[in-house]
């Protein structure tokens, strides 16, 4: 999930138990999906899934400092909609209800990308898994491509972990996306236990993740997540506002569902 404008273009137990499955690059690629009971709400302390919540990010400070030429803005909306994704897990076929999270990116006010991302919370570990995304790339107001779109269960793609719940161990490495030749984002834990300030406020108990991809070796991203909030910084983008209006009945999976076909 490295930003389009940049490309341009597990818990400790999980990480240790899956270490034998790590590839030569040292990043864990296979996870104990068979032990998960997946749900589409809740998330975890560093990656909440709260239907109805929207977060707004901007690099206005970077532009004002003369370090960025273009004003980039990002809206992340945790939709009330879910998507059912069917895939092989542990030798059987399972259907997982995922939460739809929309990301809308603009550059100097012009729409550049809208993606619909699919996440589910593994119970009881509360690790949040990433099941894919549908992507629309825009130019001059028209869709011109769908680069980086992928879906677990298709063409050999498998879920990756986007954020473990416990055991944030500095140096841990794992794949967030496992879609051969399409999307292979990886995460490495860099530091934890610090505070940060952004336009939306000051946040404590934060951690930093470095993201890379074997498909674009020169592209390196850094994200900051803070407890109880989620993503606070994405390179030069900073959390500027949080809008929350979840409904009482959003604590179940009886939302509008979209099948994976």
Regions found by a protein language model. Name each.
Residues 252-260:
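Asparagine/serine/threonine-enriched low-complexity, disordered tracts
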Residues 23-253:
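Conserved functional acidic sites
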């Amino acid at each position: 999930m490295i930003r389009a404008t940049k490309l341009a273009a597990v818990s400790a137990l999980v990480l240790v138990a899956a270490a034998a499955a790590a590839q030569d690059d040292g990043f864990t690629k296979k996870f104990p999906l068979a032990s998960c009971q997946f749900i589409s709400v809740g998330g975890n302390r560093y990656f909440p899934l709260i239907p109805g919540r929207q977060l707004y990010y901007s690099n206005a400070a970077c532009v004002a400092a003369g370090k960025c030429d273009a004003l980039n803005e990002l809206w992340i909306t945790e939709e009330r909609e879910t998507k059912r994704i069917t895939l092989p897990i542990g030798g059987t076929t399972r259907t997982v209800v995922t939460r739809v999270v929309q990301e809308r990116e603009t550059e100097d006010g012009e729409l550049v990308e809208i993606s619909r991302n699919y996440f589910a919370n593994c119970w009881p570990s509360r690790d949040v898994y990433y099941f894919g995304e549908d992507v629309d790339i825009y130019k001059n107001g028209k869709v011109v491509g769908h680069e980086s779109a992928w879906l677990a269960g298709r063409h050999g793609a498998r879920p990756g972990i986007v954020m473990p719940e416990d055991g944030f161990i500095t140096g841990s490495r794992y794949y967030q996306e496992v879609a051969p030749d399409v999307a292979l984002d990886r995460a490495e834990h860099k530091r934890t236990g610090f505070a940060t300030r952004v336009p939306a406020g000051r946040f404590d108990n934060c951690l930093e993740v470095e993201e890379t991809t074997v498909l674009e070796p020169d592209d390196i991203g850094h994200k900051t997540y803070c407890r109880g909030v989620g993503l606070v910084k994405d390179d030069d983008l900073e959390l500027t506002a949080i809008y929350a209006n979840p409904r009482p009945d959003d604590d179940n999976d009886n939302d509008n569902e979209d099948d994976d076909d």
